[in-house]
């Protein structure tokens, strides 16, 4: 029998062939030969993930053991699973994998050698192994030789849970076991589950080392200045950080340590619904041989791609290594950020397109994490809905929100970063009536903030939200900056703004131990 690479130590015995860290071309060949996908006209591997075209947050669990019981914030996001249930589920999963070919990726999460974690991902499908090969940090030959994983993901979409036996909610499951340093995934082919489960692990482990883990993108200017972009799925993190005038560090997950910031990943996972070469040339050009397209419409004859088609899902995705973006920062490490941007997709159409935040307002809005759940990023979401996701990443935060807010607040104060709130959502009315914010205008506002061009501009407090709105911005018409001016019916705007202010206040009641100066930094409710 060939090298099993220590899989028997996990409890995986009698596998078929084992393929470890295959090069991209071989993984693409094998995925095609196994009927897992097709080659699109631009060379990317195009796959479909079945009925699960987004994350399935209701199907994610954490094993409740004494070592983590008091440090995990249990609830609807972090659902507990008994240890015995995990072991029984894992035994059946291991039995299912006997005799099947397995694909192993050994690599790292974390670009900074001081904080990176060696990981292993074991896949049933070649295309998913290509995905993790492109998304995580790839090892050198010497690093691979010495690799000893500290956390393992086993992903077998073909294996399904039995809810009444396993204690799950459906046939799909994502279970994190911190004691076993093991994640098991089954019943869903959506590759984002692997990425986000490892992100959750980092969000649990890094605060103990004084590192602030963040759901954000990051880039670097010509002078080495760095900027962060926080926001939930679909708010513009990937799009706005892929700026031809700046160098991309990473598009989704970073840590902020005493030394600066670092990317957790080695790749990008971009939404590509309505992708255009005109508006997002860097992402457009990154989708080529070696990239993976998830649930994107591809003509069966010509293999031409239709990025506008949402027949399978709004949540169409492209995965590619960060070095497919020209001039990306490799390794993904930068200095302390000078600018922090909170992105929100406001479905009510009443938030300003850009506003400056005081330190207290920054903490209020970070804890609130207001945005809209955009169609397709989770199962069951077909129209935008107002939502509050603490720290712009509640689905991935195992600990209390205060842990992450305190870490970020300390970093912002210590390094004097300017914080802006940017609305990439609707203007001139709520979703369905108003229009989506112009991407060129948003880019112009973000560039002005990062370059310091708003520092000398007059700011006026928003009468409802209290945040500081600039009266002018290079490249943006003045009337766009004041959301009330974009509505035909000003009374309807006022009513909608009051409604959203009330939702902010209602949501913030759950933070009982927050200092009064932060609580007072929220919208004025009349």
From Swiss-Prot:
Binding-site residues for substrate, renumbered to this chain: 55, 190, 196, 317
Protein keywords: ATP-binding, Cytoplasm, Decarboxylase, Gluconeogenesis, Lyase, Manganese, Metal-binding, Nucleotide-binding
Residues annotated as binding ATP: 196, 215, 231-239, 280, 317, 442
MF terms in GO: ATP binding; metal ion binding; phosphoenolpyruvate carboxykinase (ATP) activity
Binding site for Mn(2+): 196, 215, 252
Subcellular location: Cytoplasm
Top-level taxon: Bacteria
EC primary class: lyase
Cofactor: Mn(2+)
Record InterPro entries: PEP_carboxykinase_ATP, PEP_carboxykinase_C, PEP_carboxykinase_N, PEPCK_ATP_CS
One BP annotation, GO: gluconeogenesis
GO CC entries: cytosol
EC id: 4.1.1.49
PROSITE patterns: PEPCK_ATP
Cofactor binding: number and manner: Binds 1 Mn(2+) ion per subunit.
Pathway in which this enzyme or protein is active: Carbohydrate biosynthesis; gluconeogenesis
Gene3D superfamilies: 3.90.228.20, Phosphoenolpyruvate Carboxykinase, domain 1 (3.40.449.10), Phosphoenolpyruvate Carboxykinase, domain 2 (2.170.8.10)
Reactions mediated catalytically: oxaloacetate + ATP = phosphoenolpyruvate + ADP + CO2
Similarity comment: Belongs to the phosphoenolpyruvate carboxykinase (ATP) family.
Purpose: Involved in the gluconeogenesis. Catalyzes the conversion of oxaloacetate (OAA) to phosphoenolpyruvate (PEP) through direct phosphoryl transfer between the nucleoside triphosphate and OAA.
Protein name: Phosphoenolpyruvate carboxykinase (ATP) 2
Provenance organism: Moorella thermoacetica (strain ATCC 39073 / JCM 9320)
């Amino acid at each position: 029998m060939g090298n099993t690479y220590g899989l028997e130590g996990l409890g995986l015995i009698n596998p078929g062939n084992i393929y470890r860290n295959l090069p991209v071309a071989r993984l693409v060949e094998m995925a095609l030969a196994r009927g897992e996908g097709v080659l699109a006209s631009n060379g990317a591997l195009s796959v479909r993930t079945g009925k699960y075209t987004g994350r399935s947050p209701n199907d994610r669990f954490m094993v409740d053991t004494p070592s983590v019981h008091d440090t995990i914030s249990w609830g609807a996001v972090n659902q507990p699973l008994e240890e015995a249930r995990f072991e029984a589920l894992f035994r059946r999963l291991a039995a299912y994998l006997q005799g099947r070919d397995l694909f192993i990726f050994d690599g790292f999460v974390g670009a900074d050698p001081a904080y990176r974690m060696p990981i292993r991902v074991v896949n049933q499908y070649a295309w998913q192994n290509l995905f993790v090969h492109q998304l995580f940090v790839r090892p050198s030959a010497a690093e691979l030789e010495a690799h000893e994983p500290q956390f393992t993901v086993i992903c077998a979409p073909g294996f399904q849970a039995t809810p009444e036996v396993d204690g799950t909610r459906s046939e799909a499951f994502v279970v994190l076991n911190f004691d076993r340093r093991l994640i098991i995934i089954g019943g869903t082919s959506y590759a984002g589950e692997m990425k986000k489960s490892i992100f959750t692990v980092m969000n649990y482990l890094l605060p103990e080392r004084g590192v602030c883990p963040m759901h954000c993108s990051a880039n670097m200017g010509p002078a080495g200045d760095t900027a962060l972009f926080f926001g939930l799925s679909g708010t513009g993190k990937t799009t706005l950080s892929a700026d031809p005038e700046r160098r991309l560090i990473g598009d989704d997950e970073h840590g902020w340590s005493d030394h600066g910031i670092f990317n957790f990943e080695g790749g990008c996972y971009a939404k590509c619904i309505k992708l255009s070469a005109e508006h997002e040339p860097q992402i457009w050009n990154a989708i080529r041989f070696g990239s993976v397209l998830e649930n994107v419409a591809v003509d069966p004859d010509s293999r031409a791609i239709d990025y506008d088609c949402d027949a399978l899902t709004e949540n169409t995705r492209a995965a590619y290594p960060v070095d497919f973006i020209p001039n990306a920062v490799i390794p993904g490490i930068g200095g302390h950020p000078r600018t922090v941007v909170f992105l929100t997709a406001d479905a009510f159409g009443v938030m300003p397109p850009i506003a400056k935040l005081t330190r207290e307002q920054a903490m209020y809005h970070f804890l609130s994490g207001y945005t809209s759940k955009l169609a397709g990023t989770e199962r069951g979401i077909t129209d935008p809905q107002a939502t509050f996701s603490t720290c712009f990443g509640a689905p991935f935060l195992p600990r209390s929100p205060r842990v992450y807010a305190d870490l970020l607040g300390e970093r912002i104060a210590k390094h004097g970063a300017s914080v802006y709130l940017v609305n990439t959502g609707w203007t001139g009315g709520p979703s369905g009536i108003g229009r989506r914010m112009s991407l060129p205008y948003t880019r112009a506002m973000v560039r002005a903030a990062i370059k310091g061009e708003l520092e000398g501009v007059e700011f006026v407090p928003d009468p409802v939200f209290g945040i500081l709105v600039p009266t002018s911005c290079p490249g943006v018409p003045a009337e766009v900056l004041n959301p009330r001016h974009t509505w035909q019916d000003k009374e309807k705007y006022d009513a909608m703004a009051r409604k959203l202010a009330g939702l902010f206040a209602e949501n913030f009641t759950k933070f009982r131990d927050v200092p009064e100066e932060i609580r007072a930094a929220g919208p004025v409710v009349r």
